[in-house]
Amino acid sequence: IVVGTVNMDETTFSFSRKVLDRAMTIEMNEVDLHGGLTERNEQIGKLGKAELIGYAVEGVDVYGANKDVCETVLTYLDAVNTVLEGTPFKVAYRTRNEFMLYVVNNLPYSKGENEEELSQGYVVARALDEITSMKVLSRIEGDDTKVSDKFLDSLSKAIEEGLKAVSGDDHTVKSISLAKLKEMKGKLVSGYTSFWS
């Protein structure tokens, strides 16, 4: 496992889609300067070697034991990919595998901020939302001939409907993907948009 960080903003040249296909993009734009000073702010806790390395490498490694969840992932990803059809942003097998692995590996994290039990649908939708931002939206950039308002609206609709189908209406209110698409659409008025803030 190789873990590293790169600070990306509008002044930095973006990575190629080929590099982004092999990376997990985690956006950390909000800063709470008071957070973590009186107690640790760890929602997941300490992770051991098994959690970090895992046993699964491809979708096939988790599909059999988690068929229902993986089929939910595939239905969602098919809807998103329908919007991406004919663009350089369409996803393929590597992204499909990472979607399945990410969602399945998030299933144990079913406690809310107040230790309440979250439904599996909510946990799956939350993971789909996060990985959509990491693996799909991070690859989208271009001028208004490549990335149009209509394209971003269609993608927003597919994501919103997909998340609602998985968990119900409540998840889309907190959707990081939908918030990012709204931000990207706002940037498009200048004639160009990208994921990077």
What are these regions (language model features)?
Residues 1-197:
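C-terminal regulatory/interaction module of P-loop NTP-utilizing enzymes
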